[in-house]
Amino acid sequence: WGVGVSSKWALEQAHNMYGAWPLNVGILGRAAGSTRAPLEEALAGGVCGFKIHEDTGAHPRTIDTTLTFADEFDVAVALHTDGLNEMLSVADTLKVIDGRAVHAFHVEGCGGGHSPDVLTMAGRENILASSTNPTLAYGINAADEHVAMIISAHGMNPELPSDVRMARNRVRNATMAAENRLHDMGVIPVTSSDALGMGRVDDTW
């Protein structure tokens, strides 16, 4: 689904789209395989780094292959970890990362990532932790509104009890409340809109 493609043609269209504006824009390519060939194609197409996403497979081989390739070519890797812990726990993911530099998306966890403890990835020397903004700023209605947002953004069915349980499992008041303070402390130094997923840029900025 719409979490990105990295073909040379698609990247060319994306780069051309930004040509009319005096902006420096970096495009992340999809990292969803266990071999280098798709990464090589995307890098040749002009990506500035790669995004590993749980919806297309944040598996051990994918993480290791992408980080190894990125280190070789000095490009960035953003990681949206395995929210259902189907392949890896947060401890397993940290072991695969093995001290290499990575940008951890959705580190609070409501937008995705290892449940319930992805927040433990924040504050590590090799990990640039970031929030996406559905949980910022934290207000009195934040927890209540997120089940519907998760279901909508991820194509779930609100009539299926299993989908509702999965959505509710991501909503944790304590980590939502802690997130703002962790930003103030610099433990989570980055935020972004996630505007095409669980995002609401107009509420945060």
Positions of predicted regions on the chain:
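Short beta-strand/loop segments at the ligand-binding rim of alpha/beta enzyme cores
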Residues: 22-27, 73-77
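Short acidic active-site motifs
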Residues: 34-38, 62
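Active-site core of metal-dependent hydrolases
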Residues: 52-180, 184-205
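Gly-rich Lys/Arg/Thr-decorated short loops/hinges at beta-loop-alpha junctions or inter-strand turns
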Residues: 1, 20-23, 42-49, 156-163
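Active-site mouth loops of central-metabolism enzymes
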Residues: 2-3, 23-35, 52-55, 169-170
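Metal-associated gating/positioning segment near the N- to mid-region
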Residues: 1-14, 88-89
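Catalytic cores of alpha/beta
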Residues: 37-41, 91
